[in-house]
Amino acid sequence: MFDLTGKHVCYVADCGGIALETSKVLMTKNIAKLAILQSTENPQAIAQLQSIKPSTQIFFWTYDVTMAREDMKKYFDEVMVQMDYIDVLINGATLCDENNIDATINTNLTGMMNTVATVLPYMDRKMGGTGGLIVNVTSVIGLDPSPVFCAYSASKFGVIGFTRSLADPLYYSQNGVAVMAVCCGPTRVFVDRELKAFLEYGQSFADRLRRAPCQSTSVCGQNIVNAIERSENGQIWIADKGGLELVKLHWYWHMADQFVHYMQSNDEEDQD
């Protein structure tokens, strides 16, 4: 179990929809500080959050998840002045625009990876941090393919690969930073938008999705926090249809164990 009491939480996402509902739940968990980094200002949402728990300090910065990593470093140097340290980093910025592959990949995958690479040194126990937890909010079509939203699905598959790689004990045993992901199923805020398929053959399915039964953003937000509280390093959760399910991870490359053993034996030989 991960206790959120007294934690310093940094949430990278637009403060609307799933991010807002997740933040509302976080504010009921007696966290000490909440930093919200988003692309546009939303003072009404910030005020709504503050009313839930006046004693929790809320900070806001406008943030472009696609900025260069060197700019992120300068940015987070300023963020850390207010936050002191970060216990939990939540990455929730997302874009589904099949007509703009670059923007979709940069927002959903590259920007998230650059954010993690920038923030990790502040959290790393061996670099003066306190350890903690990184939560990547992604999609169920990062687990199974989508013939309609091909670029979006590819970016979300990347998030899962990055999460599982970074959660390896090779890193966790050193830096004390656990990494997990929550895959959201179809959620109202997503399907309410005008959705375009990657190819015109899939457009009828994209149009039909807008009328499909979907979970509410509030239920999804609650289950994201539930997953955080139940999390262990490397876990992948599905938050869909009002429920929460732990993904059973599978290794397809049967040489993986032998390869890792080989690499570890070489490390031991180098130390000798």
Curated annotation (Swiss-Prot):
GO cellular component: cytoplasm
Keyword annotations of the record: Oxidoreductase
Active site: 152
Gene3D superfamilies (UniProt xref): NAD(P)-binding Rossmann-like Domain (3.40.50.720)
Binding-site residues for substrate, renumbered to this chain: 139
Keyword Transcription regulation: no
Domain of life: Eukaryota
Binding-site list for NAD(+): 11-34
Family: Belongs to the short-chain dehydrogenases/reductases (SDR) family.
Name of the protein described by the UniProt record: Alcohol dehydrogenase-related 31 kDa protein
Gene name linked to the record: Adhr
